[in-house]
């Protein structure tokens, strides 16, 4: 959706990635322009039920309010789950109360502490661990092991891996 440019340009949108696992969409970060890129990609909005915000910088979450509002305009009824570091709900609650009073669905914020590793989300399709920030970059978007090697944020659950 977006390559991660903190300053959106005509060629590069702010951070937002979508992972399609078993026809379920999972969004990682929701920068400005995310809903436009979803439309361009012809991905069904109704299949997106979980959004994961890596950290609380504007270029990672400024697209949320517009996306939530658009879901309401489209008559969405399925719950939307937003997983983020602590503080996002406090930031968005007043804006949702003001701009999205008549939503036809519920938005649930699942916040976590950023200091310790933990399991953020797990179902039969995907496991999403929260890891400590990489000491080299001080970012949560670059997870590193104790030996300095980096690993992926989202990995398929064992049950979702096809067996031969």
Regions found by a protein language model. Give the residues of each.
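Binuclear metal-dependent hydrolase catalytic cores
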Residues: 1-164
């Amino acid at each position: 959706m977006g390559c991660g440019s903190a300053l959106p340009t005509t060629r590069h949108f702010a951070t937002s990635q979508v992972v399609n696992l078993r026809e379920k969409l999972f969004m990682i970060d929701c920068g400005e322009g995310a809903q436009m890129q979803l439309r361009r990609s012809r991905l069904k909005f109704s299949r997106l039920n979980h959004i994961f915000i890596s950290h609380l910088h504007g270029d990672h979450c400024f697209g949320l309010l517009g996306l939530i509002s658009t879901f309401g305009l489209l008559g969405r009824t399925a719950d939307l789950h937003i997983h983020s570091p602590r503080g996002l709900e406090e930031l968005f609650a007043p804006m949702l109360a003001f701009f999205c009073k008549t939503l036809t669905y519920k938005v649930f914020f699942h916040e976590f502490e950023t200091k310790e590793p933990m399991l953020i989300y797990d179902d039969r399709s995907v496991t999403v661990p929260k890891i400590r920030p990489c000491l080299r970059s001080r970012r949560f978007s670059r997870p590193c092991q104790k030996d300095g090697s980096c690993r992926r944020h989202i990995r398929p659950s064992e049950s979702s891996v096809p067996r031969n």
